Amino acid sequence: MGDVKNFLYAWCGKRKMTPSYEIRAVGNKNRQKFMCEVQVEGYNYTGMGNSTNKKDAQSNAARDFVNYLVRINEIKSEEVPAFGVASPPPLTDTPDTTANAEGDLPTTMGGPLPPHLALKAENNSEVGASGYGVPGPTWDRGANLKDYYSRKEEQEVQATLESEEVDLNAGLHGNWTLENAKARLNQYFQKEKIQGEYKYTQVGPDHNRSFIAEMTIYIKQLGRRIFAREHGSNKKLAAQSCALSLVRQLYHLGVVEAYSGLTKKKEGETVEPYKVNLSQDLEHQLQNIIQELNLEILPPPEDPSVPVALNIGKLAQFEPSQRQNQVGVVPWSPPQSNWNPWTSSNIDEGPLAFATPEQISMDLKNELMYQLEQDHDLQAILQERELLPVKKFESEILEAISQNSVVIIRGATGCGKTTQVPQFILDDFIQNDRAAECNIVVTQPRRISAVSVAERVAFERGEEPGKSCGYSVRFESILPRPHASIMFCTVGVLLRKLEAGIRGISHVIVDEIHERDINTDFLLVVLRDVVQAYPEVRIVLMSATIDTSMFCEYFFNCPIIEVYGRTYPVQEYFLEDCIQMTHFVPPPKDKKKKDKDDDGGEDDDANCNLICGDEYGPETRLSMSQLNEKETPFELIEALLKYIETLNVPGAVLVFLPGWNLIYTMQKHLEMNPHFGSHRYQILPLHSQIPREEQRKVFDPVPVGVTKVILSTNIAETSITINDVVYVIDSCKQKVKLFTAHNNMTNYATVWASKTNLEQRKGRAGRVRPGFCFHLCSRARFERLETHMTPEMFRTPLHEIALSIKLLRLGGIGQFLAKAIEPPPLDAVIEAEHTLRELDALDANDELTPLGRILAKLPIEPRFGKMMIMGCIFYVGDAICTIAAATCFPEPFINEGKRLGYIHRNFAGNRFSDHVALLSVFQAWDDARMGGEEAEIRFCEHKRLNMATLRMTWEAKVQLKEILINSGFPEDCLLTQVFTNTGPDNNLDVVISLLAFGVYPNVCYHKEKRKILTTEGRNALIHKSSVNCPFSSQDMKYPSPFFVFGEKIRTRAISAKGMTLVTPLQLLLFASKKVQSDGQIVLVDDWIKLQISHEAAACITGLRAAMEALVVEVTKQPAIISQLDPVNERMLNMIRQISRPSAAGINLMIGSTRYGDGPRPPKMARYDNGSGYRRGGSSYSGGGYGSGYSSGGYGSGGYGGSANSFRAGYGGVGGGYRGVSRGGFRGNSGGDYRGPSGGYRGSGGFQRGGGRGAYGTGYFGQGRGGGGY
């Protein structure tokens, strides 16, 4: 092995070059490995090797690099010593001969569908017309981004970055805002004589309608186009946002100047100054620690009209790394005999370590031939496979793949392309004695499809997953053998694997490319570059029957192969047909008064249910006009199911619904009905969040006489095929997440699906016999639907993708995204870079810092990632990981009403926090499941919690913790702890402080009832699903008016979701950017006024700077957390003290009568009598918890109980939170923060002994296989 290393050294020496090796340890302490990378100047390739010792890792890396030199004909293979790895013959790479590029298009394409009577006669011819609006010819792709970056390198405009973020980020974009941009754009149009027209699209049902405005303009002086597409609650706002994006792009391209006038701010409501009661003693301690840290505090201003900024600059910077000049490409190499592509590691031991490719190929061929002869079941399956439509195209597909680097296969859902194409390729290689040269990775957009397809392919090959076929999805992997195998994975998993390159993989198949999610679009850019650098690799793109011309053009006019399905005709019906067939009469409307923000005055002209053709009877018209377009009519779905029964055509019914809530409610609605709840029906939910074993049930056949009804999201639209479906009932809606950057607004809209979506859904019905599809939208509505959905890259923040670009060394973020199939607007890219620089994830040269490298590996929002690292420093890593993981999934509460009931609110204790409620739920569930699955189920039913969500959260949390541990963080800073939510708990105080950092800039101020003010004093409401949402219109007073929240949701009104009460000191410390003082009042972020001494505020902002500096040191070497120097320890203790509510003079116990809206509803008593769920004698909520629910915290008389009940539970130890600022329950301020004992907890409370800790360590001891993303 060492010979290869010497050979490379000698070869380089002759050319006056030296190979540079970089070795790093990877894996955790128990499974230490070494990863080695070797680079040689002048070659854009990184050789990689790994092994259990450094020497072998270097040899393996050298061998990989030498293999590369052989492939590019720099070295002859016979010159290489003891090579043992023959290079495969280069695959012929003829440039594309567009054989069958457009072929004859199938007749099921695009265009508005005809009425069902004329369905067969009409031939839709709108394929080309429904183009995606590619901005200009191919050379123009993203050129504006490239232009901007080349200019930016010449003149680094740093000044704008620090300026004020008006609509959160105007300073970044030349101070252009919603107010001033549109007028400037119009001036530009007049000067350039451009006719600028906005194209509007309506999104969402009428009660919650919003608009998308888009425009493309041609810039003469640059010779290229720019494009913007923005979202707003009305046409005017959408147009303003669109104009803003265009003007900001023009500014960055140097076409438009920065705005120099005064920015007129809409005056939001002003917030009264809030008096902070900080004790003298605490202020004195603050000053001491600031002196110890050698920080200078600015004196108060002499003139109060000229306030001073208190923010201290960065105390520690990461040293800038070398700027990466060459544009990187993910390294690729063909399969090699001692490399396992699925684990990205060398095979150093066992028979495969020294086997030649010829031996491997011969063995695998013999094995397959023997199996084909002997296995009768396999022969039967082969005959079944022969019948699939795609089989007729096998030779054409294989020929095209061997002749072209990229091939697109387009075929109707169900034609067999997903399961068969990988097998065609694999069997062809095995039978031609080239098994060792073939490894195929197939990406799927969702976990369920990756797993179900892998299991199906394994079944078709007469094997279990793990042999020639395997899968890898987040939280679960069964990897196949290292040679001649197929691996199905989600796109996210493949992107995570790209860090090690696509080595040892001969074919990459990307399925469902038409879905246009951000990860697939990102992967396509990567693959396009890989193909240009390594033409021998083979890329196969597969799509449903939609317009693929855009992809074809993107991949250099590659050939398209049409696969015609053998799907049966599907008769389709619209809402008016469904009503007429079933004689449906809507139930009388609910008379209850509706909440303003759920409803909106219906615009009659836009309610398409009022438009009904003359061919329908008056009863149909009347019924239709009574149905509200915004609601999904459950009763009509029931009527259709009964109607289907009368047809006497057996088959499963697939119902498409938007989102989990509706699926869950519909399932319960049907099960409560004696007709559908009987043994004649099997009602099954299908959603990405439900456990795998539940998902699998949808594929199982049902006994004769039983009807299977599947309630699904759009997951069943293209990703998976359920064979026995004959009927589709389509709500015609789907849930999308829209994000608007300039105001940090998330909008989860249930929107009308596109025509393409409806076409796909319809196609699910004709699998086994002629089918039927019932669209629950009127024909008039159908005509108004968009043709395609917006690509995700236009509606999500780009900072996570930006981190991936840097982690994979793909060059500049902007230059890379400019190559996307539809490049995102320039302003969104600049925002992503700015966010990452602010977080210290990028250095001055825009390369990843050590912190950025860790954040890039965490599959979570970068800001949350940094919050988790801070959590580790404070030894509350587990809780922060739990909260971060929980934000990735829906809330676990099963809730029929809008507002949460007491059973769920109780989990917040008296912390007024949705995040604490989540943490408590998780803690209680984790405790309950120690008693086994039955106990877990009982607990979830009793507390009305979604067990699947809790399990997914647990898996995500474990994955996040593993990544941190593998990055070098000590395990003991991530051990599970027990928190109390009803009494003082300083660890919980710290968790809330860090949370304020994680969700910034989402800060709000409570005014009255549900009304809150957010940034710059804009109005919003407390979201109804919050534990803080009052029950009625009675006014509420919280111990502190300040809250942080997870996200702003826009329905009719704007509401803040996921709220947690914080103190003004926590805001100053972790949730502020700009802090100014005039000597009397401290102004935070230009809108929150605090009455606090100038010195105290200055000291607290100094602590923040010291904390940020500590994060810099810790991320360079995470192990130092366990032995910090005394000054840093004292600094952390100071932050712990400031995080206490009592430090700001706030007493959380005041709020124990907070929900005093009359007596507690009697029906809730059955959930919460006594101390809750018991297991084997010891109550799960024993001690601290139990008394919190019933006798303590909320008073034995329910929420309205006397405020003294807390003291009855914990009487007189320093008066609860009002105890001296030194720590009340814990005794002195240096109390044992990390230990499980320490004052309050020592008293027993909610403790399960060492069990929980032991479980945690045990889990990590075992380690986890595969995993991926």
UniProtKB/Swiss-Prot annotation:
Its main location: nucleus. The modification N6-methyllysine is found at K146. Residues 255-664 are annotated as: Necessary for interaction with RNA polymerase II holoenzyme. Residues 398-564 form the Helicase ATP-binding domain. There is a cross-link at K697 (Glycyl lysine isopeptide (Lys-Gly) (interchain with G-Cter in SUMO2)). A motif (DEIH box) lies at residues 511-514. Residues 230-325 are annotated as: Interaction with BRCA1. Transmembrane segments: none annotated. Residues 5-9, 53-55, 182-186, 234-236 are annotated as: siRNA-binding. The modification Omega-N-methylarginine is found at R1175. It is found in: Nucleus; Nucleus, Nucleoplasm; Nucleus, Nucleolus; Cytoplasm. The keyword Transferase does not apply. Residues 3-71, 180-252 form the DRBM domain. Residues 1151-1269 are annotated as: RGG. It is an enzyme of class 3 (hydrolase). Pfam families: DEAD, dsrm, HA2_C, HA2_N, Helicase_C, OB_NTP_bind. Residues 331-380 are annotated as: MTAD. It catalyses: ATP + H2O = ADP + phosphate + H(+). Residues 958-1074 are annotated as: OB-fold. The keyword Coiled coil does not apply. Residues 1-250 are annotated as: Interaction with CREBBP. Methylated. PRMT1-mediated methylation of undefined Arg residues in the nuclear transport domain (NTD) is required for nuclear import of DHX9. Phosphorylated by PRKDC; phosphorylation occurs in a RNA-dependent manner. Phosphorylated by EIF2AK2/PKR; this phosphorylation reduces its association with double-stranded RNA. DRBM domains cooperate for the binding to nucleic acid but not for unwinding helicase activity. The helicase-associated domain-2 (HA2) region is essential for the duplex RNA unwinding helicase activity. The minimal transactivation region (MTAD) mediates interaction with the RNA polymerase II holoenzyme and stimulates transcriptional activation in a CREB-dependent manner. The oligonucleotide- or oligosaccharide-binding (OB-fold) and the repeated arginine and glycine-glycine (RGG) regions are dispensable for both RNA-binding and unwinding helicase activities. This is ATP-dependent RNA helicase A. The gene is DHX9.
